[in-house]
Amino acid sequence: MPSASLLVSTKRLNASKFQKFVSSLNKSTIAGFASVPLRAPPSVAFTRKKVGYSKRYVSSTNGFSATRSTVIQLLNNISTKREVEQYLKYFTSVSQQQFAVIKVGGAIISDNLHELASCLAFLYHVGLYPIVLHGTGPQVNGRLEAQGIEPDYIDGIRITDEHTMAVVRKCFLEQNLKLVTALEQLGVRARPITSGVFTADYLDKDKYKLVGNIKSVTKEPIEASIKAGALPILTSLAETASGQMLNVNADVAAGELARVFEPLKIVYLNEKGGIINGSTGEKISMINLDEEYDDLMKQSWVKYGTKLKIREIKELLDYLPRSSSVAIINVQDLQKELFTDSGAGTMIRRGYKLVKRSSIGEFPSADALRKALQRDAGISSGKESVASYLRYLENSDFVSYADEPLEAVAIVKKDTNVPTLDKFVCSDAAWLNNVTDNVFNVLRRDFPALQWVVSENDANIAWHFDKSQGSYLKGGKVLFWYGIDDINTISELVENFVKSCDTASTLNSSASSGVFANKKSARSYSTRSTPRPEGVNTNPGRVALIGARGYTGKNLVSLINGHPYLEVAHVSSRELKGQKLQDYTKSEIIYESLQIQDIRKLEEQNAVDFWVMALPNKVCEPFVETIQSVHGKSKIIDLSADHRFVSESDWAYGLPELNDRAKIANAAKIANPGCYATGSQLTISPLTKYINGLPTVFGVSGYSGAGTKPSPKNDPKFLNNNLIPYALSDHIHEREISARIGHNVAFMPHVGQWFQGISLTVSIPIKKGSLSIDEIRKLYRNFYEDEKLVHVIDDIPLVKDIEGTHGVVIGGFKLNDAEDRVVVCATIDNLLKGAATQCLQNINLAMGYGEYAGIPENKIIGV
């Protein structure tokens, strides 16, 4: 066997990696979420450690031990650095009430109260505040049966007469008090909320008696509890408008809470730890509703509460982003579900049906397959063309597996002794939603043995080790396989792999095979963009803003208000529904809360010319899919990062000063660049062909860049005389800048104490002696000579001068004495040219207006 490193797949960290992990956890994680700091010696008193905007007090006698126990508990459940990062990324990025909705079955409180309280106490001590709602079904049944009354159900819904209602109410209050008391005994502040949250009408008074159909959810009691630093503990009792108490199934009530709060996690705790297949007696690990719901509901064992639970979960997920899911688990697996990729119990999600194909003609279209393949590293880097690969497939014996939207596509070649997974191109959404696991499970089912190759630097390398039986490292690539026990077959596999690596090295190719890789597309902005299209359209344009409550939405509304042709037709925000759109004078516009069906109807009626998706990352896809399904005439611009890394044949990248303006003008869908990414690209691009190393970008933004959700990064008091570094490596803008200029960059963002505006200091290594300082200044002036929104100066630009203006100022050029490094400074208003102004430029181009229509001349520096 050739000499190289034979790797053994392991699922646990070794001692060395564990030490590094603990070290990194101590530095980056514990400080961020522990309820008290780790200090030495233990006798030091811990007081008034602030968590969010509530105050938590820990006594000196138990503070250290409680924190130590919490950290040990966390380490036992989070076994990889990736899962630590997942915790930091997700659970510190949302408001506290958006963390999780946890529905607790009544049997859990009776049988597992201590475990439940311990798990909730753990979450509390790491600064997380789930909304807890519990049932009381077993207790009610037991009390009724003790009275000689048989519990009565129709379609899984308890018939609740007045006597039963009295029992239900008493049981709810008893169980609520038991849970709150158990939590308080563990030092957790908990608030019983037994009424006042759900307003309901009768579901069917004649049929079900005192059973409610929830019409609205009052958020204030829950938000007040969390703000005060107490876990909200709810029952599912509801009231009519006149005060009549009604019984509501706890699963249904939990679903209504999830619709209102849109939490990161929706968890149903029951004593079985999931849904049990009544035919086999086995726990179901995953239910993909789009594919399995109809057949599942026909099963004889799906009845009563199980049928109601599945139906309610489906109705809930139909109105949440496709990435949402519901987990049904036991209390012992709660932390595993919240903090690990593997999860536990039964996960229910909408999912997609997987389609098996064996010819190109079976795909929805060649263009659809082409777009999916653009995600492959070898193709996106230009080392292989889509056309040549498709021609290769036409003459190959292959089979492919993919979900319906082609977010995950696996192509297996069958012309070798051991079939080869030749391509497996997956979007970020596919990884996030575990579509990759679905596809791989099908591969295992259909192929007893399989081989594939991955770059050792792949972000998901641990996932591949987990899926494989063996592996072999050579030249920065890892060969994986499973299902092979014969040593001669393994030797042959490795020999062929080594030969291919040696051949690739000879051809000076350092890229991976492309399977699962995540490399950027190399592009260059060293040449100017195409001429600016003339604005010839003077017809009115109707704009619909989805998610317009943030700073960017407000600035865009202000710009549209001064635009000669554009008008706001619809503005959607769940929080502001019913309120008047402020600072818009062309007409009276009232905030709506547009749902999927509303958007489809508007698109069918041709009521909108341009849709603006002003939503957080990973949220807009259901809206985009709905608009596209109508095949109407409208266009879409996405202000999130969701579509900045896809093929430009699908989403044009909307940076007019650097990208092809004609491409933007002709696009049906436009990805609006990020604020930091815009300023950084404009600062680096004139020197692209001179780069000789890793450019570094030191950026400081005003706190408006941290959004409107409360956090230390947008708290003026916390920021006073302060500067907060964050996401110092692998920030999404680092990827965006690198992908667009065709060179890796290092990006280090910070938040400053001012409101809006970004300052960038960019260090660019160049070939020694290739440019003089005068040549550099001239290069920049010539590069942006005809760009109205880019102003080049000699002095260092200042944030106070750029705030409220609509362009980018570049200056402060400095060449070091060795003449091998250039420093350039730039400023940009993150809310305007970094977001709203750029959005308007793109809309203008796509609508055929003048590119700068609606942008105030007196707010453009240099004009």
From Swiss-Prot:
Pathway where it operates: Amino-acid biosynthesis; L-arginine biosynthesis; N(2)-acetyl-L-ornithine from L-glutamate: step 2/4; Amino-acid biosynthesis; L-arginine biosynthesis; N(2)-acetyl-L-ornithine from L-glutamate: step 3/4
Positions of the catalytic residues: C675
Protein name (Swiss-Prot/TrEMBL): Protein ARG5,6, mitochondrial
Pfam families: AA_kinase, NAT, Semialdhyde_dh, Semialdhyde_dhC_1
Superkingdom to which the source organism belongs: Eukaryota
Localization (cell): Mitochondrion
Organism the protein comes from: Saccharomyces cerevisiae (strain ATCC 204508 / S288c)
One Gene Ontology cellular component: mitochondrial matrix
Reactions mediated catalytically: N-acetyl-L-glutamate 5-semialdehyde + phosphate + NADP(+) = N-acetyl-L-glutamyl 5-phosphate + NADPH + H(+); N-acetyl-L-glutamate + ATP = N-acetyl-L-glutamyl 5-phosphate + ADP
Enzyme Commission numbers on file: 1.2.1.38, 2.7.2.8
